[in-house]
């Protein structure tokens, strides 16, 4: 299996911009034969959002994750994307695995580093 890593610098607070960049990366990776594209932590929201991260966080069953599923399906490539997840009145540093066919799989980071990550 060919795996592509997208080492992007996410634009803090601009999810639409970050999704557009991820879309182009998925197209490029798929055209190169990759079956999985991986992104860094918080690829959707970006680091540095500060207190705005709570407002930017998205649910695992929300529109942003569904958009990732559409990108995956259109390009025939699975995506592993870091994002700030809101659930149960809390924010999690999570990763979504989408393949365009099945329900997204969500992993919540459990070994948090430093005060910032523990405050999520």
Ranges and model annotations:
Residues 1-11, 94, 106-109:
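Active-site-proximal beta-strand elements of phosphoester/diester hydrolases
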Residues 3, 18, 26-56, 72, ...:
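Active-site beta-strand/loop signature of hydrolases that rely on acidic residues for catalysis
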Residues 9, 43, 84-85, 112:
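Catalytic metal-binding/acid-base residues of hydrolase active sites
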Residues 13, 17, 21, 55-63, ...:
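Alpha-helix N-cap and loop-to-helix initiation/capping positions
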Residues 22-25, 68:
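Aromatic/hydrophobic pocket-lining residues that form π-stacking "cages" and hydrophobic walls in ligand
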Residues 60, 70, 86-120:
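Active-site catalytic loop in hydrolytic enzyme cores
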Residues 61-87:
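A short, hydrophobic beta-strand-centered structural micro-motif
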């Amino acid at each position: 299996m060919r795996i592509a890593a997208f080492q992007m610098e996410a634009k803090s607070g601009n999810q639409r911009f970050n999704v557009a960049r991820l879309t182009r990366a998925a197209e490029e990776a798929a055209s190169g034969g990759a079956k999985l594209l991986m992104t860094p932590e918080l690829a959707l929201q970006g680091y540095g959002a500060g207190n705005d991260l709570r407002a930017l966080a998205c649910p695992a069953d929300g529109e942003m994750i569904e958009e990732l599923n559409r990108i995956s399906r259109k390009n025939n490539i699975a995506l592993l994307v870091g994002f700030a997840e809101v659930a149960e009145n809390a924010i999690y540093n999570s990763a979504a695995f989408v393949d365009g066919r099945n329900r997204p799989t969500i992993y919540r980071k459990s070994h948090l580093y430093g005060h910032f990550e523990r405050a999520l």
